[in-house]
Amino acid sequence: MFQKRPWITLLAFTALGFALTQGILFSRWGMNVGLLAAAGVLLWRAWGGGPRRRGAWWWLLPAACYGAAMALWEQPMLSPLLLLGMVMALGLWALDGIHAGGPWEQVRPFFPFGEMEAVASGLRRSARAGRLGRVAMGVGLAVPLLIVAGGLLLSADQAFYDFFEGLTNSLADTLTEVVAKAVLSLLIGVYLCCFYLQAEREKTPALRPQREGDPVVLGVMLGLYCGLYLLFLVISCRVLPEMLRPGGAPELYSGYARQGFFQLCAAAVLNLAVFLGVRRQRCAGRGFTRGAQTLLAALTLCLIALALTKMLLYIRLYGLTLLRLYTSCMMVALAVLFLALMVSLYRPLPMLRLGAVLAACTLAVVGLMNAGSLVAQTNVDRYLAGDLQEMDLTQYTDFPDAAAPALCRLLAQTEDPALREEVLTLFEDALSTREHLSWWSDSLQRRQSAALMTQAVEAAGE
């Protein structure tokens, strides 16, 4: 299709890119529908457009869980980036050749930029074949020249500037938004053309052979690397008894918890790169090198456990938030990933498939746990029991519907007039902004919480 009608194909994919940007970036329901559509396309490729994958329909389960979570509950912090991770995981399962080669060979179909030259040559050939295409090419070449020359002329003469001032002021904001969306949609369209052309040609990337690594070099490198982790863990664990002692040094572990997660992410990514790099060497399975990799995985698990301990201590002191809850879930997922890496050193495991399963299941669990309600219920229970000194209500402005049942219980049981006033103000603000919400941001939880908040505000007014 692209060889016969390249411009029509590009325009169609650009329109699809515009629909995707509008739906995914500005609509929760658009995100949901986009995810399910991507899952359907990738599964169709697995079942109809390529070799039949055994058990491929299981990927509909996490997609359905995520869709149900978005329809039932508020999801204030689940961004389109997580959706992209889910779609990538689905694609890794569905694409042909998933079991062959290293990680880069397996994800290479998602980066079809080698087809960029073929797409550009096809567009040029089609444009030169017709008069309308040549006119469009001339307009496209003239646009950047007009922009540059126009800017220079506007600065050179005040009368010329005054002539266009009213037009530019009225169209500046509109053109900025339209141009930004058009450029983004066009880039997505070009990417989809490259992806389509690659699939149409059914290219299979050549697999790179393993390198002949030096076991001494790898052993020394991994030994020094593990020594750094050992030193870090020894120094960090020296203050662990003080942190675990009731009422001891809260400022110490609060500082640890603020920095621990980001340090953990950087260390985990670095360790993952080390694992993938070492496993590309033929000597990776030999005794000393394999033992050093095992030690590195074990030290990484200890680091994750230490960081998770700090986070739990921080939650015990300052309460639970969505970010702290999601951080804890990511720590657990990282621990499972590195445990699988350790096992794969002694027993062959499909690590890419396991990673995709782990990512999809983590997103499904996070979506179905009703995180906002869990955070509010936990904090209210601890505050009413006297385990939490202060009740911070500012975070609930992001998810008032999820927190409404717990806050109604707090409103009925607390005797603090200032806290009651804060809860009522939160409810009134949520009810006032509800009128401006569009239909695609609706959920079952939002409908149920409206009655609770209205009843609480009316009861307080009486």
For every predicted segment, state its role.
Residues 397-462:
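Extracytosolic and intramembrane catalytic regions of membrane-associated proteins
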Residues 143-159, 227-245, 306-312:
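Alpha-helical transmembrane segments and their membrane-interface junctions
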Residues 1-7, 47-56, 119-135, 162-163, ...:
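Juxtamembrane membrane-water interface segments of multi-pass membrane proteins
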Residues 226, 349-372:
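Internal/C-terminal transmembrane anchor helices
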Residues 1-44, 294-306, 310:
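Alpha-helical transmembrane segments and their cytosolic membrane-interface
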Residues 19-161, 180-199:
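Transmembrane-helix bundle segments that line or gate the permeation/cavity pathway
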Residues 365-390:
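Hydrophobic alpha-helical transmembrane segments in integral membrane proteins
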Residues 134, 168-184, 249-269, 320-330:
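Short aromatic-rich membrane-water interface segments that cap or initiate transmembrane helices
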